[in-house]
Amino acid sequence: MSTEDKMATDDHYKTLEVDRRASDAVISAAYKALVKQAHDAKDEERWKRLNAAYEVLSDTAKRKKHDRTAADSIKRGKVIGDYRILEQIAEGGFGTTYKAEHRLTGKLVCIKHASHVSAHDEQILLDEARSCWDLRHWGIPAMRDILRMPDDSMALVMSYVPGPTLAEVLEKKEYNNGLDAEHVAWIVDRTLNILKYLHFNGVVHGDMKPQNMIIQPEDHTVVLVDYGLSKVKPTRKDGALGYTPFFASPEQESGRVPLPESDFFGLGKTMIFALGGDVEFIKVPEHTPDAMCEFIKHLIKQDPLARPNWQDVDLCEEFRKIRKACFGRTFSNMKPLKI
């Protein structure tokens, strides 16, 4: 094993007596205090361990590699509580997501390991989980459990939802130029129904984007994932923001807490993306029906107070009228998308 790999597998957080989610300032302060103790005690071996640990944890790239090595210890077949890990399916700003199965029932679940969440925000995460605990809707995964992982961080257990994301669908060759407007319409119709349920239950999604929309084309169904995490900020230093540029609302980018209207902004940007438009420069394809263009314009206004809100308008009903005006029907009889 190389010196670098050895450094990546040592428990440097334990050496510096800090939590794995500690800030750079806390790590620096702990290092200075412990090095002084080692120096005063003339403990050369401890001094070397402290320096090795600080060398890794004070460097963003090395710390990231160290954390990834620890996360990689959660392999296929590992048992955590009542669940057996099957595979890693995603990695994002909050941590790693795994597909797992319940050991007794064999039911599939999704475990969201919040490894990049601070100790302070873990309490916020717990509060958010409580608010989502009893939510039941065909368009959102159900909250099943909360776990403590081997590294003492928190993980949310949710029902597993199969299917590609909207982003993955749009990566297919036949959809490189965007989806047919009527396909986008049924996706938006389903998404508005889900958002209405979440918002009326006091939950803001906070990261509306194609990557968080699972498409089940045979049933013309959409499932929103990663909901209810809008108040939790990731601790990673590698660009993770807790929201997604180009899809995030101006208020989120300025650091404010997202609102229901923030979800509408993200939905509007997602519509542009799905239609084959330019999300960055907000250009909608020319073939898009005028009524859908106007709907998008209302959703993506810079001022959240200028966007629609549920108190003034039922967006579900409004969009069904738009579907009727654009396509002559409110329910699509189109063939399923090819996935």
Show the residue positions of the predicted features.
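Short beta-strand micro-motifs within the conserved protein kinase catalytic domain, predominantly
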Residues: 142-154
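AlphaC helix of the eukaryotic protein kinase fold
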Residues: 118-134
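Activation segment signature within eukaryotic-like protein kinase domains
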Residues: 187-188
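Catalytic-loop of the protein kinase fold
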Residues: 199-215
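Conserved activation segment of eukaryotic-like protein kinases, specifically the C-terminal portion
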Residues: 238-251
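Protein kinase glycine-rich loop
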Residues: 86-93, 97
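Conserved short submotifs of the Hanks-type protein kinase catalytic core
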Residues: 151-165, 169
